Amino acid sequence: MARWGLFGYNSATDVTDQPWFVQPREVYAVTLKAVDIEVTIRGFTARVDASLTYHNDTDKALTVQYSMPVDEGAAVYKFEAVVDGRKITAQCFEKKRAEQIYKDAVSSGHTAFLGREDNLTADIFHLALGNLLGGSEAELKLSLLMELKVKTDGAVSFTLPTVLNPRYCPKDVDASHHNTDIVTPFAHPESVTSKPYTFGLKAKVQGGHALANIVSHHDILIVKPSDDNMSAEITQECGRFKPDHDWNMLIYYQNPYKTHIIREKGDRSSTGLMKDDLLMVNLHPELPEQSYSHRNEVIFVVDRSGSMQGEKMQSARTTLLLFLKSLPTGCYFNVICFGSTYSLLFPSGSEEYTEQTLEKALELHHSISADMGGTEILQPMKHIYSTPPKPGFARQILLLTDGEVFNVDQVKELVSRHAHETRVFVVGIGHGASTALVHGVARAGHGLAEMVYQQDKLQLKVMGLVRSMLQDSVQDVSVTFDVEPPGGIKLIPKTLPIIFGGKHLILYVRVPTSTEVKSITVSGVVGNNKISNCFNGSDIVNIHDEEKTLHRLAARAQINEWQIDNEEDVAEEMITLSLATGVVCRRTALIGVDEDRKPVGPKPESAAGSPMMDLSLTPMCMTSMSFRVCVMYFILIRIDSDLGVFIYVYICKSWNTEQYST
């Protein structure tokens, strides 16, 4: 797991012409001095400003890198670096152009930094800072935006990911699509900070919602509400946070289910999306009881890979047990466990839910452990889709996993292709679970996702998902507007929403600046019943936000939607939207160059210090076994001087024998 670790290699070392596993370079830990986080929550959105201060204790100019987890729905839009008092502000460019600018700047001796989303998964962000002088201090400032949803128990959950676990790279994934120039923290234990550093977190909750409570299951918070309970300030005592879990805070509003519509003013001097106004519609549609059916086929897909050891497997077993005992009579079910291979509880297909079949499932439940190797999630999903749903029954898949894989796009594409006949619900297990897979697959499969930890109210979350699974799909969904003058209204993304009874639904709507919105109607058909939710324009709250939070969150929602489909068909649109809003996607990057400072020393003969290294695979992409992770860390630390040789031997052994798990 990553603990905000930054590490560097000598900028005078040429690493561009040799394979990564024999690179003749030294790797140095760069001391982390302080982490300061400021969070501003307004209703159902959050802005996070993270500041990380590092010091290069060596006497060498280093090119330093770090990888950090982010929520897959977060809009990263601003990056700054302050190096020895000089501020460098990044701009968003097309990725290849940004990489070339960075390479040219660093090879010329300038200090520069480059921020990129991982090529294979949207929940990892990489940063390279070139030519950090010996004895220099660097403060890295990242700003991102997040949408927050009301959970089953009525809490608005804010999570700041701080745990970055190794990701398994399946055998059929083309590793060349990974960020081949990134030195990941999984390969270098030096990047996991062991020295003490200060951690400060301040949060503000405001935005017109009366507060009932603010709590955390993991951390001790100091909460100071205002006299009218319309806002609060939250702090965490310095030194009290241990970065072995994702930082989470639950906000309870007094009336979280009330429809809330915000109109954010656009930038009149801009063009496109940023010029127009943006509506954020928050609603909780209710469905009639007749919308829920027992004629369902539920297939549980349980991750038993090595990364699920310990608390994760305990949570998975508890969650599975609750689901098994919550199924209604008359439905059909099956359980598929997977790792490097997969196995079925009922090999011939789903069977009716009876006392006898439940007893067989409980016997399997008692024996479940993290003993099936790698995380080959695609094959069991393909097996399910290879047979049609039972006639007259709606098929639902419930996936329980930590999501620690790199083939997220493959899984999402497969699930999306079959979403018309099979819905997919996902339960993300444990801290550091991949939000890109958990939320991305649920979205692609027209389902819902929940993240669970040991301390969670599991029963409440399980019952909420069971109720959603048993709900018939809402058909013929439409969103209509009564506006003056007519026309010009656009949903972002264009895809119509998936509606679940009582669940928080968020819509983004692009509105021309001169248009008056008189009413909004969301309607559909479920079973033989028509449903309709109508809202008056008088309910809209107008705001002016310099950060353009809603505009950028809408852009991120559109980018996520595009990345489910054939991305190549919309590549130009994705780049255009990213550049216009500053929201980074996998085809763009943030680049900043210190043009004012004189170059650092003589220009190297080649692009020394460039991040463009030949890294075809990182060691930890080859395994999902926690045991092997621990052994690797231990050996690397003990034979630091032979780091490159050891990794070469280890990876070649794994590659030749295809030992992807212990």
Show the residue positions of the predicted features.
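N-terminal, polar/Ser/Thr-rich
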Residues: 1-43
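Short, solvent-exposed beta-strand/turn "edge" segments of beta-rich domains on protein surfaces
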Residues: 37-47, 54, 131-137, 498-500
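Asparagine-centered strand-capping/turn motif at beta-strand->loop junctions
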Residues: 54-58, 68-70
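An acidic, Ser/Thr-enriched
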Residues: 78-119, 131-136, 141-301, 456, ...
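Short, charged loop segments at secondary-structure junctions
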Residues: 101-112, 269, 293-309, 321-331, ...
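Von Willebrand factor A/integrin I-like adhesion domains
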Residues: 360, 416, 432-472, 476, ...
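Aromatic (phenylalanine/tyrosine) cluster motif
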Residues: 633-634, 646-650, 660
